[in-house]
């Protein structure tokens, strides 16, 4: 598996597409920090991360200082809409591929972006997705729901 991934990584260097990430953010917790750290460690570099922050009294300015590729877009709670907020972030991007994520869905490994990009290289594929794994502390019901 490692050799196959390495070969695919070499292919990506030749035909590398620009990838941006859009994340709606509201009252970010510890999972959000973990998400940002894991996005930084992806084998396929993320060009820009658009944080669509619903104003909640917290500042995300430290994210712009910590991560050079972060843009914070402040929106009011009245402006927030699940689809429209993501669309607003997507429209700011000039990337070939935009990945929409949630603030509490952390990549399980460093290959998430690479695998999504690879799936989109197929001529007959227009959309790719990854599933969110339940956390270790999730209840049995949450674990069942998350794996459906």
Summary of predicted features, one role per range:
Residues 28-41:
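Short, well-formed alpha-helical segments that are part of the catalytic scaffolds
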Residues 46-56, 73-75:
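Short beta-strand/loop segment that forms part of the nucleotide-sugar
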Residues 52-61, 105-106:
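A conserved acidic beta->alpha catalytic loop
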Residues 76-93:
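Glycine-rich, basic loop-to-helix element that forms the pyrophosphate-binding segment
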Residues 98:
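Short aromatic/hydrophobic "clamp" motif used to bind/position activated sugar donors
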Residues 18-20, 48:
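Cell-envelope/extracellular polymer assembly enzymes that use nucleotide-activated donors
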Residues 75, 101-103:
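Catalytic metal- and UDP-sugar-binding loop of GT-A-like glycosyltransferases, i.e.
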Residues 110-142:
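Conserved donor NDP-sugar-binding/catalytic core segment of glycosyltransferases
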């Amino acid at each position: 598996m490692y050799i196959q991934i390495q070969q695919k990584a070499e292919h990506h260097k030749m035909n590398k597409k620009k990838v941006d990430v859009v994340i709606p953010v509201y009252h970010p917790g510890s999972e959000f920090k973990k998400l940002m750290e894991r996005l930084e460690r992806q084998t396929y570099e993320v060009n820009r991360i658009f944080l669509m922050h619903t104003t909640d009294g917290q500042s995300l300015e430290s994210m712009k200082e910590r991560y050079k590729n972060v843009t914070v877009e402040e929106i009011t709670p009245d402006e927030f809409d699940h689809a429209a907020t993501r669309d607003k972030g997507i429209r700011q991007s000039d990337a070939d591929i935009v990945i929409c994520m949630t603030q509490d869905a952390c990549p399980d490994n460093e290959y998430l972006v690479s695998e999504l990009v690879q799936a989109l290289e197929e001529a007959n594929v227009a959309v790719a997705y990854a599933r969110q794994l339940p956390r270790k502390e999730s209840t049995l019901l949450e674990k069942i729901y998350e794996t459906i």
